[in-house]
């Protein structure tokens, strides 16, 4: 066996997805729009010439618009920070040469930003697949360890297709020579 055949590495994308860029931009712009209308209703002066804020009373409509504007803007900034930090990005590495499985992810900034888990391959009991269809589909591959610990291996947010999940899970189970559950 060559070194390439002795290890498998799957990259896991983080928060830098197209949808997050769109949502972050919309939340920031929408929040600023609401906040501007709320402030202009308080000042009784049109800050934006496109909207007549004189029709909006400050109490209660302008105050509520200020509240939603601040909330929307802060949520947009939070999404942009997730994109900046690339939260959740990492890899899953299965190495038969060293005899270890390594699961790495980037977390929130701070002392524990690097989430780096390493387990001996002998600890792996099986690979489990969970597939739920519906409005919010759930397609996750779990690494099942001794002691009933389960570690998710797939990314959150945009689920992979059923074919991709099944192929990846079968490839992992065959490579690690463990059973495959849930398919």
UniProtKB/Swiss-Prot annotation:
It comes from Chlorella vulgaris. The chain crosses the membrane at residues 21-43, 63-85. GO terms for cellular component: chloroplast thylakoid membrane; photosystem I. NCBIfam families: PRK02542.1. The keyword Plastid applies. Keywords: Chloroplast, Membrane, Photosynthesis, Plastid, Thylakoid, Transmembrane, Transmembrane helix. Belongs to the Ycf4 family. It is a multi-pass membrane protein. Seems to be required for the assembly of the photosystem I complex. GO terms for biological process: photosynthesis. It is found in: Plastid, Chloroplast thylakoid membrane. Pfam families: Ycf4 (PF02392). InterPro entries: PSI_Ycf4_assembly (IPR003359). It comes from the Eukaryota. This is Photosystem I assembly protein Ycf4. The keyword tRNA processing does not apply.
């Amino acid at each position: 066996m060559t070194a390439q055949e002795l290890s498998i590495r799957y990259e896991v994308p983080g928060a830098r997805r197209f949808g997050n860029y769109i949502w972050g931009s919309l939340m920031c712009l929408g929040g600023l729009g609401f906040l501007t209308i709320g402030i202009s209703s308080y000042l009784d002066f049109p800050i934006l010439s496109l909207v007549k804020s004189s029709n909006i009373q400050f109490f209660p409509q302008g105050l509520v618009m200020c509240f939603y504007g601040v909330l929307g803007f802060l949520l947009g900034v939070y999404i942009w920070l997730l994109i900046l930090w690339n939260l959740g990005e990492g890899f899953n590495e299965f190495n038969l040469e060293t005899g270890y499985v390594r699961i790495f992810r980037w977390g929130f900034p701070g002392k524990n930003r690097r989430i780096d888990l390493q387990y001996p391959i002998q600890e792996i009991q099986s690979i489990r697949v969970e597939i739920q269809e519906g409005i919010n589909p759930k397609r996750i591959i779990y690494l099942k360890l001794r002691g009933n610990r389960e570690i998710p291996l797939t990314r959150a947010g945009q689920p992979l297709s059923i074919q991709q999940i099944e192929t990846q899970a079968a490839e992992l189970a065959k490579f690690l020579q463990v059973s495959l559950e849930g398919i």
